[in-house]
Amino acid sequence: MIVSVLFIIFVGLGGGITVGAGFVAFLTVMGIIPRLMQLTKTMRFVQAYEAAVILGAVCGGWETLHMNHLYLTKWIAVPVGLLAGLFVGMLAAALTEVLNVLPILAKRIGLRSKIIILLMAIVIGKIAGSLFHWLYFIDHS
């Protein structure tokens, strides 16, 4: 019994350290956070970005383990959701720009002169998919 519990603890800690190291390596090697700061012109808030990443990883891990529920009113949940969506969108935009995905995609599919149309198609598709998910799946589950 004790050996199996110690093994589970060992595997859990090993997995957590591996995922955490991969997350930090992803953000560091890809240069996502510096590019995000450059795009938003917020280089003076480097410590705030570092603290947000660390705090987000720690709180996310804690919430995953304990499965606590935050009972928020809709007046608090909506702004928090909007800010979270804004952050994820900006992070995705920074990742896309760092990897130079859109120019390569536009060149390969022959839309080099119409890259703005490609970008708007991606944005409208993302908005439509999100609305479909929230309006259909959330209400019907």
UniProtKB/Swiss-Prot annotation:
User: Per the UniProt entry, what are the Gene Ontology biological process annotations, in alphabetical order?
Assistant: sporulation resulting in formation of a cellular spore
A single Gene Ontology CC term: plasma membrane
Subcellular compartments: Cell membrane
Predominant location: membrane
Report the transmembrane regions from the record.
Answer: 7-27, 45-65, 75-95, 115-135
Describe its membrane topology.
Multi-pass membrane protein
| Annotated InterPro entries | SpoVAB (IPR020144)
Protein keywords:
Cell membrane, Membrane, Sporulation, Transmembrane, Transmembrane helix
- What is the protein name for this chain? Stage V sporulation protein AB
Protein's organism? Bacillus subtilis (strain 168)
